[in-house]
Amino acid sequence: VKLDLALRELHRSETSLGRRFRRVGERHQADHDVFHLCADLAGWSDDHVRRITEAGTSHGVRLADSPPRIGQVMSSVRKMASVALGRRPEPGLLLLADLRSVYLHAAAVSVDWELLAQGAQAARDTDLLELATQCHPETLRQMEWANTMLKELAPQVLTS
């Protein structure tokens, strides 16, 4: 059974998604809704990573326990850049690009959850199937948020 490969890839992609949400939030701190929602959505990915790590341990797969955190220096730099960008006309285009990236990455994570679920079902691994059943809907909600934001912002940004 190659479920260990699915767990490793899912761990990597969820870790990356959480990091991506944090970067977008920090880059767009001037938009408080985006900043706070990105922090919340990154937290969902952090929880998924923790649960994937626990599942990996019970399946003999060693995975890094916690997603890497961005250092204080980089956080300060991004905050200053966010304030500076907030005064320029291009932050809308940057936000669209960031949301597009988040959406596409969340879609890839969604596929990883689906692969794990299908593999777990075929292997009759109820623990992994339950994990996928519980976490995958949150990934779909992360995608939905990014898609909704794209739909709301695109007309204004692309026609101004």
Model region roles, listed by residue range:
Residues 3-26, 73-123:
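Acidic/histidine-rich alpha-helical segments that form the ligand environment
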